Amino acid sequence: MDHAAWLNEETGEAAQEAYKYFMRPDPNQREFLGPIEEEDDPLTGMRAKFRMAKVGMVRNAKDEDKKEVKVYLGFNDVTYLPHIRIPNAKPLQGWYQDKHNDKRGSRARPCFSEAILTEPYGGYCTVGCAFCYVNSGFRGYRGTGLISVPVNYGEQVRNMLSKSRTSAAGYFSSFTDPFLPIEDVYHNTQQGAEAFVELGLPIFFLSRLSYPSWAIDLLKRNPYSYAQKSLNTGNDRDWHKLSPGAISLQDHIDEIAELRRQGIYTSIQVNPVVPGIVTHDDIRHLFERLAAVGNNHVIVKFVEAGYSWAPAMIERLHKRFGPERTKAFTDLFTENQAGAQKTIAEPYRVEAHQLYRKWATELGMTYATCYEYRRGKPGTGEPAWLSMGREMITADQCHGQRVPMFTRTDLDQPFQEVKECAPTGCLHCADDNEGKPRCGSELFGAAKALRSPDFKKIVEPTPPEEDGGERKIIPITQID
C-alpha cells in the first residue's frame, strides 16, 4: 500500500483534502499558511521540511481563535503526513467506563479484561475509514487534518510505567492507526511497546495497515501478547471503499497467516459491520478466509455513531457506495441507544450475532461482541440497556484468550502475572465467585474505569483471618 500515492489521488476524500491543503507549494492565503522551509532537525537528525500554519482547535474556528503551529511535512526529501509535535503524551489509562455505570447518557463497560490504552499518535488518521469516529471529532487536532506526535513517546511511557505497581496489556491503539507511515520517523509505537515488553507486560496492536517485523518480534516475547486487525467485509472491492488508506484485504489475510505460522494468537475485530453496505454473505466470506489461515478469534460489532456526526458518516457512505446501498443502510440505522449513540435496529443485530456466532463456531473460531447492547426486559430488574457480551461469547474474554493482570511489589522489578485472575477477566470475576474478587482487591476486582493513580497500587491476595473465617476483602492501600 503506497499511502502517499493514495493521498495524492483526486477522489475528494477528506484525508486527501487535508493533505493537499498543507502540502500546496504556494497557498493563496498567506495569513493561514506560511512558506515551506527547511532546517536541520535535532530530534530526528534529518533535514526537515516544514511550514508555519494557523489552525483552529475546533471545526470552523474563527480566525481570531486560531493558533500558530509548526507543521512538519517531510524529512530528507521524503514527504510524510502533515503533523505537529506536542510535548506531553496522553496519560496511560484503562477503559473509559465502570462496570456499574449509571450515569445518564452513558453506558456500562462491556470489556471483560483490562487493557492500558496508549496513544503514540493522535489527531487525524489518514487511513480514511468511512465510519471513523476519530476523524469525526470536532475538537483538537483531529479537526485540522493534522496528526499530533508526542515527542519521545517511548521515554514518556517508560516514565509512567516506572511509577506503576499494577498493569494490564498495552493496547496500541484504539485511536489513530499505530503503524502510520510517520512511525518510520518517530518510532513512537515501537518504543512505547518496547517499554511494556521490557517490564514483562503483554501488548497487542490493532491496525488496518501492515505489521512491521519489529512488531511481530515484540509479540513473540510474551505468551499473552496477541495481534489484532480490523476487517469488516470479505468483499475486496468494498473493503477498499470502506478503508481506502488501508492495505488490501488479501494482504491482511496473508499477514494473519504469517502471524499464525509464527505462533502468535490472532484476534480479528470485524468492526464495524455496516448493514446495507456489508451483507451476511460478505461476513461469511470473511470468516471463511480467516479460518482458512488459522485465525483464532473474531469480535463483531455493528456500526454506531454519535448523534452529532452520524450525518457526516452517512454522507461519506453515500459518496462511496451510492444512494441505493446507502438507503439500505439508513433503513436499518434507526436505533437511538444509550451513550448518545445511533446504531442498527436491535432485532437485526441480535439475529445477525446468533448467525455469525454459529458460523464462527463451525469454522473453528471463537466469537465475541464489542459494545453491543440490548434493551433491558421490563419487570426483570435489568437496567435500561445492558451488554450482550456474555450472552454471545464463546471465548474466555471478549478479545479471545485469557490475559491476566500484572503486579509487582518493588518498582525496580519486572511485573508478575496475577495468578488469581479468572478466565473472564475482571468484568465477571466477582460475579462467578460469590461476589468476591479472586485477587481480593475491591479496586481491580470491580472492573472500574482505571486511571494512572490506580495503577500505582498493588494487587495482592488478602490473607485469611486468624480465626480461620472467610477472607476479608479490604481496599488496597497505595504505596508511595
UniProtKB/Swiss-Prot annotation:
User: Does the UniProt entry include the keyword Iron-sulfur?
Assistant: yes
Q: Which reaction does it catalyse?
A: 5-N(alpha)-glycyl-dTMP in DNA + AH2 + S-adenosyl-L-methionine = 5-C(alpha)-glycyl-dTMP in DNA + 5'-deoxyadenosine + L-methionine + A + H(+)
The Gene Ontology terms for molecular function here are:
iron-sulfur cluster binding; isomerase activity; metal ion binding
Q: List the disulfide bonds.
A: none
One GO biological process this protein is involved in is: symbiont-mediated evasion of host restriction-modification system
Q: Has the keyword Metal-binding been applied to this entry?
A: yes
Record-annotated residues binding iron-sulfur cluster? 125, 129, 132
Question: SUPFAM superfamilies in the record, alphabetically?
Answer: Radical SAM enzymes
- Region Disordered, as annotated, extends over 457-480
Ordered alphabetically, the record's keywords are: Host-virus interaction, Inhibition of host innate immune response by virus, Iron, Iron-sulfur, Isomerase, Metal-binding, Restriction-modification system evasion by virus, Viral immunoevasion
The protein's role, per its UniProt record: Isomerizes 5-N-alpha-glycinylthymidine (Nalpha-GlyT) into 5-Calpha-glycinylthymidine (Calpha-GlyT) as a step in the pathway leading to thymidine hypermodifications in the viral genome. As a final result of the pathway of hypermodification, 5-aminoethyl-2'-deoxyuridine (5-NedU) substitutes for about 30% of thymidines in the viral DNA. These modifications probably prevent degradation of viral genome by the host restriction-modification antiviral defense system.
Protein name, as recorded:
Radical SAM Nalpha-GlyT isomerase
